[in-house]
């Protein structure tokens, strides 16, 4: 499964987010309840399938004697996770804490990131993607990624 593209949505007054059909169907395909692990990072919410979240969390368990900064990072990411299920209407309810962290009020954008997807406030995402990414092509090339645009 691969999450791709952007989908612009609005929360309802109760903080529920209607997932795009392709996202909803992908979640229901891997979990009958449409479970998703939603955590905080980079000023947005990051959603993982149950299997991918278990792998991610297991990676932290393998770190022996983590630094204070790593433990603080773990507190942010693992401590910020909430397990959600897609309701019968294809929605997930965002918590107040998650909405505050990501600056979400009403308008959101769901952004595919391959094995996971992100939920951004529309304003925050516009600021992020409005950056100059000219130097990123050098970083891609140094990593062996050909990006011929």
Swiss-Prot record:
Record localization: Cytoplasm, Nucleoid
Highest taxon above the source species: Bacteria
Alphabetical UniProt keywords: Cytoplasm, DNA-binding, Repeat, Transcription, Transcription regulation
Primary residence: cytoplasm
Pfam families: MraZ (PF02381)
GO BP: negative regulation of DNA-templated transcription initiation
Molecular-function GO terms, alphabetical: DNA-binding transcription factor activity; transcription cis-regulatory region binding
SpoVT-AbrB domain boundaries: 6-52, 81-124
Any one annotated GO CC term: nucleoid
Assembly information from the UniProt record: Forms oligomers.
Similarity section: Belongs to the MraZ family.
Protein name per Swiss-Prot or TrEMBL: Transcriptional regulator MraZ
Source organism of the structure: Oleidesulfovibrio alaskensis (strain ATCC BAA-1058 / DSM 17464 / G20) (Desulfovibrio alaskensis)
Lineage, broadest ranks: Bacteria, Pseudomonadati, Thermodesulfobacteriota, Desulfovibrionia, Desulfovibrionales
Gene for this chain: mraZ
